[in-house]
Curated annotation (Swiss-Prot):
The gene is infB. Coiled coil: none annotated. Residues 385-387 are annotated as: G5. Residues 47-70, 105-121 have a biased composition (Basic and acidic residues). This is Translation initiation factor IF-2. Residues 138-149 have a biased composition (Low complexity). Residues 249-256 are annotated as: G1. Residues 125-137 have a biased composition (Basic residues). Residues 274-278 are annotated as: G2. It holds the Pfam family IF2_N. One of its GO terms (cellular component) is cytosol. NCBIfam families: IF-2, small_GTP. Belongs to the TRAFAC class translation factor GTPase superfamily. Classic translation factor GTPase family. IF-2 subfamily. One of the essential components for the initiation of protein synthesis. Protects formylmethionyl-tRNA from spontaneous hydrolysis and promotes its binding to the 30S ribosomal subunits. Also involved in the hydrolysis of GTP during the formation of the 70S ribosomal complex.
């Protein structure tokens, strides 16, 4: 027997709540009011109290029924009805004074019952219009229906679940109670609600706690955005996984040679011209522990993957040649690694060369906050030679040490998730993708969603070219079975069946299309103040490029002095030279603005900036740069005058003429040149001259414009 409230029990026994409370007090059970909850044993005791009374009542009713005068037979009743149809008003008149007389109560009740019976018979006769046909027996009038027992309430559930909100009707259904009862409870709590009104979480919890029912809210997970889903594994399910290492550095400083020396294979000889052409992922075993290496072409692929939200690298090995020192791409690699917040191990390569000077390299790297441990810093430096394999063991030991310090762990006993390292279309096998498993275990036959495409893993090949049936965390494998070629940096996830994988992939493709059509989200000086005002911006990331090192230093120092409340200027990269595609790639990944001082973006950089909606600001006066950034941060930016490039020409030859000066013989490579055009003379990405054209001639004739032939 379940628990009941006092009023519910009273309703069940068809007695007032006060009567039940009185009975409980007689039983020495204290209750405060009709809302008090009765335990199952108390309900049972009350049942015993009420059973005898019920029996007596039934006996009394039976006695009363026997004492009543005999009802007339059906035939007599019909005759009686026929005779009295016309004397209805007289009978009514006779009945009135009967009430006034002080007759005894018992007789009065008998009379009223007889009168009610007569009325019923008269009404039945009137409906028929005539008395019953001769020879046919009239059915005896139905006996009074006994009062129906109280409706038994459903047992309360132990727990209910809901998603978002519930209406009063829905909550009542879940609790097995009438909506009116829920509305009454809400009213008692000071909440006015109708049957179709939505209830918030607090109201649902209050009602359920009053009934003693547990509440659980379901959280809807958008599986299409599985990159954002963070599955928290139990600590006992986590096991140690191999570290994922990326080797970065300047051209010809020995990145691939170093990896080749570690793997004991001839990767460099297979590459065209000894330069890495694609991203390769390899796994090596050191002291019974595995290390996964990603061999990237410079740092572009690293940044591309990071721009897509794929943080795959655990440790960055920065390769610097001992005879060459810190170069522009070395600085870029440092900035990329720092922006990704990845620990750096510096590998000073080529120490076997006579002109090698490792101490100079260490001194140069201190300018970029990479201080060696032996000099009191926290950066690990390894001196080695990839050619002679000197110092390799020390480097590998340091990788394992950093890995141990980082406590890299993953759960292999779940559906696999990870990142695409590279992808291509093979003529024989179709779309092929190199995947890096970051958690879970990938098996042959698993339904998989990769980026906006899907498929079923048909075959898996490891870095040695051998077929494998499953891949564990930090293991790179090449898979086939996808419907389309994904992009490098795309995330993948395994689902329960191919049908669901297809639905998720289609939804992701649709969402990507909508995002491409939507308004740009990249930060620009025009909408900077709006983003600051809305609290979206806490840091303003800038990439600074200038014509000379002195200008770079002066510009960086001036920009860092800008003080606007709530926003900090952060220089993520500053270098000498033209604005390149690599700068745009870094700006895309870091949501930064590119500032060019006396330099211009090359053609590829322009195209990339337009495609990725990166804001490039070009200036020739430092004061103007500072003023523009400060004004943008304070929301006082002047309207921008857009510069339209109508053509480009290449200087093929120069002629010096006295009294005139230098004449440039040009070949139009793009668009056209007009006589009233303003021109810039750019040499190796640096603006040498800016002004107007004095004269424009084709052969000896004065030409209004010069177009591409």
């Amino acid at each position: 027997m379940s628990k009941m409230r006092v009023y519910e029990y009273a309703k069940k026994q068809n007695v007032p709540s006060k009567d039940v409370i009185h009975k409980l007090k007689e039983m020495n059970i204290e209750v405060n009011n009709h809302m008090a909850m009765l335990e199952a044993d108390v309900v049972e005791k009350l049942d015993h109290q009420y059973r005898p009374n019920t029996g007596k009542k039934e006996e009394k009713k039976a006695e009363k029924k026997t004492e009543k005068p005999k009802r007339p037979t059906p035939a007599k009743a019909a005759d009686f009805a026929d005779e009295e149809i016309f004397d209805d008003s007289k009978e009514a008149a006779k009945m009135k004074p009967a009430k006034k007389k002080g007759a005894p109560k018992g007789k009065e009740t008998k009379k009223t019952e007889a009168q009610q019976q007569e009325k019923k018979l008269l009404q039945a006769a009137k409906k028929k219009g005539k008395g019953p046909a001769k020879g046919k027996k009239q059915a005896a009038p139905a006996a009074k229906q006994a009062p129906q027992p109280a409706k038994k309430e459903k047992e309360l559930p132990k727990k209910i679940t809901f998603e978002g909100s519930l209406t009063v009707a829905e909550l009542a259904k879940k609790l097995g109670r009438e909506p009116s009862e829920i509305i009454k409870k809400l009213f008692m709590l000071g909440v006015m609600a109708t049957i179709n009104q939505d209830l918030d979480k607090d109201a649902i919890e209050l009602i359920c706690s009053d009934y003693g029912v547990e509440v659980e809210e379901k959280v809807t997970i958008d599986e299409t955005n599985f990159e954002a889903i963070e599955i928290v594994d139990a600590p006992e399910d986590l096991v140690e996984r191999p570290p994922v290492v990326t080797i970065m550095g300047h051209v010809d400083h020995g990145k691939t040679t170093l990896l080749d020396a570690i793997r004991h294979s001839k990767v460099t000889e297979q590459e065209a011209g000894g330069i890495t052409q694609h991203i390769g992922a390899y796994q090596v075993t050191v002291n019974d522990k595995k290390i996964t290496f990603l061999d990237t072409p410079g740092h572009e692929a690293f940044t591309t993957m990071r721009a897509r939200g794929a943080q795959v690298t655990d440790i960055v090995i920065l390769v610097v040649a001992a005879d060459d020192g810190v170069m522009p791409q070395t600085v870029e690699a440092i900035n990329h690694a720092k922006a990704a917040n990845v620990p750096i191990i510096v590998a000073i390569n080529k120490i076997d060369k006579p002109e090698a000077n490792p101490d100079r390299v260490m001194q140069e790297l201190m300018e970029y906050n990479l201080v060696p441990e032996e000099w009191g810093g926290d950066t690990i430096f390894c001196k080695l030679s990839a050619k002679t394999k000197e110092g390799l063991d020390h480097l590998l030991e340091m990788i394992l040490l950093v890995s141990e310090m980082e406590e890299l762990k993953a759960n292999p006993n779940r559906r696999a998730v990870g990142t695409v390292i590279e992808a291509k279309l093979d003529k024989g096998r179709g779309p092929v993708a190199t995947l890096l498993i970051q958690a879970g275990t990938l098996r042959v036959g698993d339904p998989i969603v990769v980026g906006t495409t899907y498929g079923r893993v048909r075959a898996m090949v490891n870095d040695s070219g051998r077929r494998v049936k499953e891949a564990t965390p930090s293991m790179p494998v090449e898979i086939t079975g996808l419907h389309e070629v994904p992009q490098a940096g795309d995330r993948f996830m395994v689902f329960e069946d191919e049908k669901k994988a297809r639905q998720i992939a289609e939804a992701r493709a649709q969402r990507q299309l909508q995002e491409q059509r939507s308004v740009k989200t990249r930060v620009s000086l025009d909408d900077l103040f709006e983003q600051i005002k809305q609290g979206e911006m806490k840091e303003l990331n800038l990439i600074v490029k200038a014509d000379v090192q002195g200008s770079v230093e002066a510009l960086v120092a001036a920009l860092q002095k800008i003080d606007v409340e709530g926003v900090r200027v952060k220089i993520i990269h500053a270098a000498v030279g033209a604005i390149t595609e690599s700068d745009i790639s870094l700006a895309t990944a870091s949501n930064a603005i590119v500032i060019g001082f006396n330099v211009r973006p090359d053609a590829n950089a322009k195209r990339a900036a337009e495609s990725e909606k990166v804001d490039i600001r070009l200036h020739r006066i430092i004061y103007n740069v500072i003023e523009e950034i400060e004004a943008a941060m304070k929301g006082m930016l002047d309207p921008e005058y857009e510069e339209k490039v109508i053509g480009q020409a290449e200087v093929r030859q120069t002629f010096k003429v006295s009294k005139v000066g230098t004449i440039a013989g040009c070949y139009v490579t793009d668009g056209k040149i007009t006589r009233d055009s303003k021109v810039r003379l750019i040499r190796q990405g640096i603006v040498v001259y800016e002004g107007e054209i004095d004269s424009l001639k084709r052969y000896k004739a004065i030409a209004p414009n010069g177009a591409r032939v």
